[in-house]
């Protein structure tokens, strides 16, 4: 499972001209699901993302989490995070999960966010969406469970 997490001052997602999700200060999470992902990766990624302390404290140091700033979360499904650009000029998306698994784990991710105390605003799986954000910093992180869950911890 992959996420591109951006610290934002605000963000919104629009479908067919209607804003369906909107947040103030918090995290915009673009979420991609791989074909071998399970609920285990989903829970790990949600807990990791929502626990990050990437907001500045009074000393300007990245030390505060969502809870400390009363932050919000906007989650948007993004199968193109599994785009493969190795051959040719047009990306292949065969490395992404199929729609059934992708939607199931996207919905599970949303449920876990809520369970963790951050009811997310969100887009619609498979829809054509327009996403607007005012990035803060900018601070953008790429989280990939294949790397995070399998690499030995550095001391």
Where are these regions (language model features)?
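RNA/tRNA-interacting regions in translation and RNA-turnover enzymes
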Residues: 11
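Compact, glycine-rich, soluble single-domain proteins
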Residues: 18-70, 80-111, 115-116, 121
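Residue-level signal for inorganic ion chemistry
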Residues: 45, 76, 139
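Divalent-metal-activated hydrolytic enzyme cores
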Residues: 114-129, 134
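C-terminal edge-of-domain segments
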Residues: 131-144
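Short, charged, intrinsically disordered terminal tails
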Residues: 144-155
């Amino acid at each position: 499972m992959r996420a591109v997490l951006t610290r934002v001052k605000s963000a919104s997602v629009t479908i067919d001209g209607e804003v369906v999700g909107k947040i103030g200060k918090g995290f915009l999470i673009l979420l991609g699901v791989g074909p071998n992902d399970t609920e285990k990766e989903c829970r790990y990624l949600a807990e990791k993302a929502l626990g990050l302390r990437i907001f500045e404290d009074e000393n300007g140091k990245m030390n505060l989490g969502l809870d400390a700033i009363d932050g919000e979360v906007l989650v948007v499904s993004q199968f193109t995070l599994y785009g493969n650009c190795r051959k040719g000029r047009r990306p292949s998306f065969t490395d992404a999960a199929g729609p059934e698994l992708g939607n199931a784990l996207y919905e599970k991710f949303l449920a876990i966010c809520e369970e963790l105390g951050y009811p997310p605003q969100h887009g619609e799986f498979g829809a054509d969406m327009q996403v607007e954000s005012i990035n803060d910093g900018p601070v953008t992180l790429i989280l990939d469970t294949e790397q995070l869950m399998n690499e030995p911890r550095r001391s």
